[in-house]
């Protein structure tokens, strides 16, 4: 029976709770610092991401070209915003370290630059982002140059329309055209991006698709596709299709769940254990307690109960979609430790009268409070525990949707939380050279 029996006991230096971008980023930064790490979390929201890595895309409804300048402005107007509490150099290092890690593992990204890139959305609108996957990088370049390009969509694919993209971008991109083809081997019924991406792992499918693309490309120098260029080797799939078609190819995100998000999730689940992280995916921590010598996480899997003993913990459980925060008739609560949540005083004040109110909705800034070391605070303003740190959009005083800053908050605050946890662990002298990354009792 699930949950019965003697718990399996594990010990580690750092436990990361959460499997979204903040949780995986924390594990990456911990691995790079040789901190023995265990990560636990249910599915998280990674599959809902576009693959773009935003820092700050909008401020007050206006498009942000220079996110670093916007960061300085944010510090002036919103000093409690999580990004305002971080040094710009640390944020840049966090993005660089994160993208370098992904690139070394086979998922290349553009490096963080001075200005945002203008990237495409599935609806043919534009957004500002700091880094994009290499498979998407040609899109912003082609848009800026008004290069001759054809967007190709597929019969039976819902949620991605080349005609819609071309219509919405006509004034900005006059040389953009569109074509619809049949995906090889999927001539009937609905088709799905994840299935298409996995099919393109097969050489024969790539050759058939390339032939179909050549037939409709015409004089276009570039071909834009929905994000389907393989699941585990997207850069190689793109390179081969470019060779076979003789044209530069780029991806455009689809509606979620999206292939770029699934790629990230599957890459992390494959690579992090190879780097020494003990990954316990698809499981939710049911209890977290602190003792004098550490913290204990309680959870269960199909084989029974598990206890993970850690010297430090990073809480990166997200907001509502990921289950870090829960909405109840009496208010919003943090589900694991019942940490106090900064929120509107009354449920009636969660939302403004107009859905499109440019000020946003107060509920979207709800979250937990932290001190300057990113340790969660009690209602009295004291640290909940010296071993507990927090990262990601569970933090209060930020509306990541309006600011187009969700990934930036996740990556940058994970970097800070790991930095502070490393400092704490070093002070406790828990780093033992030559020790096994994780010990099982």
Regions found by a protein language model. Name each.
Residues 10-12, 303-312, 384:
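Core beta-strand elements of the Rossmann-like FAD/NAD(P) dinucleotide-binding domain
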Residues 12-39:
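N-terminal Rossmann-like FAD-binding beta1-loop-alpha1 element of flavoenzymes
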Residues 15-17, 285, 308-318:
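Short hydrophobic core segments
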Residues 28, 323-332, 385-386, 393-429:
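A conserved FAD-binding loop/helix module that cradles the flavin
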Residues 41-76, 186-199:
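Conserved N-terminal glycine-rich FAD pyrophosphate-binding loop of Rossmann-like flavoproteins
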Residues 160-170, 203-218, 223, 229-287, ...:
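Helical element adjacent to the flavin cofactor pocket in flavoenzyme catalytic cores
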Residues 303-305, 341-347, 353-400:
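FAD-binding beta-loop-beta segment adjacent to the flavin cofactor pocket
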